[in-house]
Amino acid sequence: MNLFRSLAPMGLALALLLPAAAPALAQQGPLRIQITEGVIEPLPFAVPNFVAETSGASQLAQDMARVIAADLSGTGLFREIPASAHISRVTSFDAPIAYNDWKAINAQALITGSVSASGDRVVVKFRLHDVFSDQPLGEGLQFAGSASGWRRMAHKVADVAYSRITGEGGYFDSRVVFVSETGPKNARAKRLAVMDYDGANVQYLTDSSSIVLAPRFSPTGDRILFTSYSTGFPRIYLMDVGSLATRSLAEQPGTMTFAPRFAPDGRTVAFSLEQGGNTDIYTLDTASGTRRQLTNSPSIETAPSYSPDGSQIVFESDRSGGQQLYIMPAGGGEPRRISNGAGRYGTPVWSPRGDLIAFTKQHQGRFHIGVMRTDGSEERLLTASFLDEGPTWAPNGRVLMFTREGAGAGGQPALYSVDISGRNLKKVPLSVPASDPAWSPLLP
C-alpha cells in the first residue's frame, strides 16, 4: 500500500546575478552588530516598500519588503522603524538616497530594492545602506526566480543583510520538516510536513494512515529520514524530497529501528535498534547497506547526533542509572559522560558551529531546552515549561526550534524558537498542532 501522497517538488532555482558585488559586501565597515551573550540593543533599520519596475509588480514589491523586515526584526537583533515614521519615499532604485532623512528617524541600516515581473519570472534588486556613513555597502545585488518562489528571494535578501551586519551566516532561506498532529491526545493522526522557517508554505509529505516521528534532513536537504509505524512497529524510512519516493532502511526481523540521523557525509545514518529488549546505536551505509554496531550495553542507548566534522557522536543513555548524555568516537569506542547536573537529559543535537550541544532536560517536574559546551561545561537552560523537548539547530547555530506542549487533555503541541542566550522566545505561526521540528541546511 502506498502510504505517501505525491506533491510537486519543493526545489526552486535562484540565480545570484551580480556575483562581483559579493566581495564588497564582505568588507569591514562601521555598520556592525557584535553578537554576544549580554544584552543587545537592537539595531534600528528601515525597509521601505520596494519599487515596482513593471506593471503588476506593486503588491509583490510590498510583500517582499515586509518579509525581509519580518526576518530581520524576528531575530531580536534588529528593530524595524515603521513606515509611518519614514520621511523619505524611495521612488526609484537608482535615485540618490536622502540619508539625512533616515538619520532623522535614527535608522542605522536601510534596505532599498526594486521588483520586476515578466510572466513567471521575477527579479529583485537590492542595496544595503549604512545610513551614518552616507553610503551603500557594495554595488547592489539581484536575485531571479519563478514568481512562486518570491518568498525565497526575500529570505535570501534578508540573509545577505544579516550576514553583512553581524558577520555571521543567516538562516532565513531554509525549511523545517515537522510532524503535523490532529485529533485528541490519545488518538492523534500524524503526518510529515515541511514549511519555511517562519511557518509559511506548509506542504504535506505523507498521509495520516500511520504514525510518523523524528524526521531529519540530510546535509544537502534533498532527503529526509523519519520513523514510521506503518508495519505496526517503528521502522526507519528514507524519503527523496523532490519525488517523495520512499524506502525502508535497516530492516531486520524481530527488531525495531528509530531515532535516525545523518552523518555529515550524507551517506551514513546513525540510529537505534532494539532487539530482545536491548537498545543500541548502529550505523548504516545507505548506499551499500552495510550495518555496524557502535554500542553494546544492557542499557538504552539512543538519539545519536554527529559532530559537524563527523568524528564524534553524542547520544543519550541510562547506563549510569539515569538518563544522561555521552560522547563517543564516530566509529565506536569508550563513551565519556558530559552531563553532570541534576535531572534527566535527552535528545542531544550538536551545533553546526561545533561549539555547543543542545538537549532536553527534565528536572523537578519541568522540562527545559538547554545548551552546554561539548565537554559538558557552561550548561545553560534556555526555557522552562510543562513540556519542552526536541531541539533542532538553525543553520547558523544561533537559534533553536523545539516542541512545546501544554498540560491536560486540551494541551496541543506547537513549535517555538529561542536564541542561544535564552532571549527572543516566540511561537512559530502554524494553523495546526505540530511537533518534532528539524531544520534544513540553507537552501542552494
Curated annotation (Swiss-Prot):
Main location: periplasm
Biased composition (Polar residues): 287-310
UniProt-annotated location(s): Periplasm
Signal peptide: 1-26
GO cellular component term, pick one: periplasmic space
Tagged with keyword Cell cycle: yes
Keyword field contains RNA-binding: no
Subunit structure comment from the entry: The Tol-Pal system is composed of five core proteins: the inner membrane proteins TolA, TolQ and TolR, the periplasmic protein TolB and the outer membrane protein Pal. They form a network linking the inner and outer membranes and the peptidoglycan layer.
Function according to Swiss-Prot or TrEMBL: Part of the Tol-Pal system, which plays a role in outer membrane invagination during cell division and is important for maintaining outer membrane integrity.
Family: Belongs to the TolB family.
Official protein name in the record: Tol-Pal system protein TolB
Source organism of this protein record: Cereibacter sphaeroides (strain ATCC 17025 / ATH 2.4.3)
Lineage per the UniProt record: Bacteria, Pseudomonadati, Pseudomonadota, Alphaproteobacteria, Rhodobacterales
